[in-house]
Amino acid sequence: MTGSCCGSTFSSLSYGGGCCQPCCCRDPCCCRPVTCQTTVCRPVTCVPRCTRPICEPCRRPVCCDPCSLQEGCCRPITCCPSSCTAVVCRPCCWATTCCQPVSVQSPCGQPTPCSTTCRTSSC
């Protein structure tokens, strides 16, 4: 397909009439259609030519992301209510280890510090 594409790394790639570009700053291999505006990027393996979407839309624009989409065993974040007062519990993820789950207290701003006791098994 021909047409203007966004981004320098994937400027020559297009799929489904849309452009492909990195969806996460921390994971340049992760591509998504540029039309995805409010999305949650999953930590996935590199997909050649962005042949399939690897993001999911948020139901609300305000989302809580305690792990900041760090690489590792992070699960896709869930969208909080617009007030962001719901308590979200999910693993605090790092590169190679999984810490004990931490609670994100209202107003879903920052997670409590990650537990020093980490497990080596997958989350």
Curated annotation (Swiss-Prot):
This is Keratin-associated protein 2-2. It comes from Homo sapiens. PANTHER family: KERATIN-ASSOCIATED PROTEIN 2-1 (PTHR48425:SF1). Residues 5-112 are annotated as: 11 X 5 AA repeats of C-C-[CDPQRWG]-[APRS]-[CIPSTVD]. Belongs to the KRTAP type 2 family. In the hair cortex, hair keratin intermediate filaments are embedded in an interfilamentous matrix, consisting of hair keratin-associated proteins (KRTAP), which are essential for the formation of a rigid and resistant hair shaft through their extensive disulfide bond cross-linking with abundant cysteine residues of hair keratins. The matrix proteins include the high-sulfur and high-glycine-tyrosine keratins. GO terms for cellular component: cytosol; keratin filament. Interacts with hair keratins. Pfam families: Keratin_B2. Keywords: Keratin, Repeat.
